[in-house]
Amino acid sequence: MAAGPCETCIVKRMTVLATALAVALGGYVVADAYDVTPGFLTTRPTESEALPYPSVSSASAPETLPSWNADAKVDNAAVTSALGSLAASPEAHGHVSAVVADAASGKTIAQLEPDTPRAPASNMKIVTAAVALRVLGPETTLKTTAKIEGKRLYLVGGGDALLGSGGANPAAVNGRAGIGELADKAADAARKAGVTEVVVDSSLFSGPQRNPSVTGGNASFVMELRPLAVNQSRNSGKAYTANPDIQAGQAFAKELAARGVPVSGAVRRGQAPKQAREAASVESAPVRDLVDFMLKHSDNTTAEILGHLVAVKSGEPASFEGAGRATLADLKKTGVNASGVVVDDNSGLSPKNRLSASLLNEIMKKVASCDGCALESITSGFPVSALDGTLDDRMRGSAAAGKVRAKTGTLSNAASLSGFLETKSGRLLTFSILIDGIPDGSFTSARHAIDSFVVSLAGA
């Protein structure tokens, strides 16, 4: 991204961001809908009907949406004082790094140990979002394919772990493409070929299915990583179940049988031979929507899958190590200070990850000044304070309610928050806060310290 974007572009982008915050405060969020390389990625636009304008009954939008005020002032002394209070707060417990900057000019207002690498928890997903949007492209979709060789039908995974169990749902991210939809498309060819067996091809991803650094209870927060799953292999209790690709294959075999394809026997794994012919395919929601889903819900599985796909696109093995190398390489290409950065996974679950507040804030500034670039969609995925996602129950009843779009991060010993906020004067700020080294059992207190700091910023 070129340095020093034009002032008009910045004002335009700031207005979009501020309006997005105002709209969120009014009670609804406008969602972008887009589509999108050969193989498991496709650049062909997907066909779907226009969706109705979103609305909710619990709140209404204000009659006039305020635009960003380019002449608004910020009390820099108040920001500096608030940061000092955060650093001295007994609630913070751990080691604090933070950066606050003016979104329009990019100038830093206050900072504390900005370049110290710290455990980012789920703020790692901000990096994953930026890298996935740049490397894969916001309009790219993930392709699940049915291929036939002899009497075998191969279900080839392309990275979509959010397949629906039935037909397609163009209004959803989870379930945009469906196993039933694929069976509808493949059934005729399967019957003509005399298919009797379903084989699952999960060869797109290599290496371990679980990151060895993610242990204990944290391992239960992410799916066994395969490039194919129905609803991320969650059961009715929302827990992840084993062998998600095999489960998807079993569901597909059942759908084929219901359409007169006499499949039988156990579904197994195997790589489709080169001569296998494609019978049908379905496509996921575009990467920009997957990024939104990941950020809004802090979805670890989507984060790891996007990282593995970045590795494939970058010529690295589709493993946790390959994803880490590809992610770091792309970061360095953007010119940010990546000193001390460690990318051990793409979700933030690994305690080995290290990012700096300055790096995260640099990404925020690039998003803020972006006019039509790949990163522009990141803000729509950030939760809104006191409204939705992982911020729905935070900062309620405060000056920051509905004024913050940010990504949360929580581990037992680390807490983080990075994003954008609108001050009481109408000025837009970028910020990043990382706290690590938090004693066991104290992360809730550390999150409260972060929230108190952000509320102070909103009043500056």
Stretches with model-predicted labels:
Residues 1-24, 242:
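N-terminal export and membrane-targeting signals
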Residues 26-65, 141:
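C-terminal region of N-terminal signal peptides and the immediate post-cleavage residues
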Residues 49-117, 183-194:
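Beta-lactamase-like hydrolase cores
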Residues 94, 111-127, 131, 135-139, ...:
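Short active-site loop at a secondary-structure junction
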Residues 95, 154-180, 187-226, 233, ...:
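Mid-domain, small-residue-enriched loop/turn segments at the edges of structured enzyme/sensor domains
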Residues 106, 120-138, 228, 251-256, ...:
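Active-site SXXK
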Residues 111, 312-460:
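Small-residue-rich helix-loop
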Residues 224, 231-376:
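A small/polar active-site loop signature that marks catalytic segments
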